[in-house]
Amino acid sequence: MRHFRFLLALSAATLATPASAITFVNQISVSGSATDLATIGSGANFNRLGGFGSDLVYDSATNQFFGLTDRGPGGGLIDYAPRIQTFALNVNRSTGAIGSFTLNATTILRDGGGTAFSGLNPAFLNGNAANLGRSLDPEGLVRLSNGHYLVSDEYGPSVIEFDASGRQIRTFTTPANLIARRANGTPDYVAGRPDIVTGRQDNRGFEGLTLSADGRTAYAVLQDPLVNEGDQGDGRRSRNVRIVAFDVASGQSTAQYIYQLESRTVINAVVPTATFSATNQGRSIGVSSIHALSDGRLIVLERDNRGLGVDDPNARTPVGLKSAFVINLAGATNVANISLAGSSALPSGVAPVTKTAFLDIRAKLIAAGIAIPEKIEGLAFGPRLANGGISLILITDNDYSVTQTGAGAQFDVCTSGAGGITSQVALGGTCTAGQSLIDTRIFSFALSRDEALSLGFAAVPEPASWAMLIAGFGLTGFAMRRRNKALRTVAA
């Protein structure tokens, strides 16, 4: 077990809020220079505790969180071993505030033979862009009831089952229309447009993964539209993102649905001085996470590519979108056999999932005076609260605070924070005084009792209710004792 110092930032907000409110509570930061528990080497490419906010899962039985890394600090150019970080957060059950962060385990993801998967893209790892091999860029995580994991990946895009030790058990069958292919039909897991003409966009595969309440269906969501499904045959111009349903028992896909991203027109109204272009719609705006609710609805986390991160260490570009939405598949058209190529408009008779605003993260953080991170990617409901509400935990992917050139030369990104200064130093070097590596940030929100009930969470008696219930039992017991005593007296 390893404990880390963290920066605790409490908001001025309290939980004395109206029913159906969601309140930002506080944040903590895990140092960008912290190390994990892997024993395969030291340094940013081996054991730096970073990037583990690509997705987040909470297990109420063990009160632990599971964070997933992506392909590593090299952007597909470094042989990094993707992993799952198991950690604990001290969550105040009265307020929802998060405290100390404790790393409990680091699980390397390995193939069936025990060899670690690699973040290297297939061309570098296998010498062939058409051979996926052990290349893995994890982005979505599910923990099954037996302790196994389902992991979604961007390269394939793939869904893979691992046992509790991180060893591969099986790979689900990816629908053919999602696999990136060249004009001759050859798969290409590395290239982008115009080299690929069908399938997922490069680096825009399965970004989120979740499991239905009954454990039978897994839902994987692409980050953005397919490469050719948009006006002018360009997915970057479209809002239509595919959600894929998988039968967990067989590993086969059963349906595909359309989730529509927020319109850039609406987002541009929020950031009129730094607008998104037509080809930013389905490229710079996308889905980061998906979470199933007990009643069959899902929560989708959607964001733009702006905010404090390795590409903007001082958060100078205004953020347009960081929001969560509740969606419903009921009534949505199964588009598994429907092509949307060449158009951003849905065909007549095709209905997308319905979508309702749930949480404007951007607005909450601005109101709290907090710099908005670029990659808020993990979302999980945490412990229930004493008032019958529930905590909601969000986590960032800090990209290991590393940037690199196209040739693979890496540098640590140091910053003094939003509006400050930044510098790049040699990997593992020392940041200039007043600067530090970009931290992983974990945010806590509190949902009221009514909000929790509206999402399908079971009712939990509030402390006052428990007190009245216990008092009632006490009075009943007292009355019974008085009655028994009276009966004994009469009998005597």
Range-by-range predicted roles:
Residues 1-7:
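Bacterial N-terminal signal peptides that target proteins for export
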Residues 21-458:
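Sequence/structural signature of beta-propeller domains
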Residues 462-481:
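A short, hydrophobic C-terminal helix/tail in secreted or cell-surface proteins
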Residues 477-492:
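C-terminal membrane-anchoring or membrane-association module
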Residues 16-18:
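N-terminal signal peptide c-region/cleavage motif recognized by signal peptidases
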